[in-house]
Amino acid sequence: MLPVRIHAVWFSATGTTKKTVTRIARRLADALDAVYEEYDYTLPAARRQVLTIPAGELAVVGCPTYAGRVPNLLMPYLRDMVRGGGALALPVVLFGNRNYDDELMELSKLLTDEGFYCLAVGAIVGEHTY
């Protein structure tokens, strides 16, 4: 079954993660004739809301790499406030051309633990904050 809705979900300090995730998600939505939605969890207020993506939908979830890991600031939100409900996920990490170390595995595990089925992953070189 093809997803009926594609969600672009990101934390983006420089705008590069947003640009990358939205481009991937929009192209998927266009190709699959699915509804497209965005969710930006960059600002703290957005991380106070539970985000639930139900079965039959797909989330392209992106975050930057800090020291080769999912940023500590984001771990509680991704672990406690993002729910998969059987949805598909495409984890995407952006890194500053050094190394993304374990972040891709870490983000995939966080999403899987919260009820997502990761069907692909992406590690993209992009502008970094430091």
Walk through the language-model features, giving the residues of each.
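FMN-binding flavodoxin-like domain, especially the glycine-rich phosphate-binding loop
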Residues: M1-P44, R48-Y130
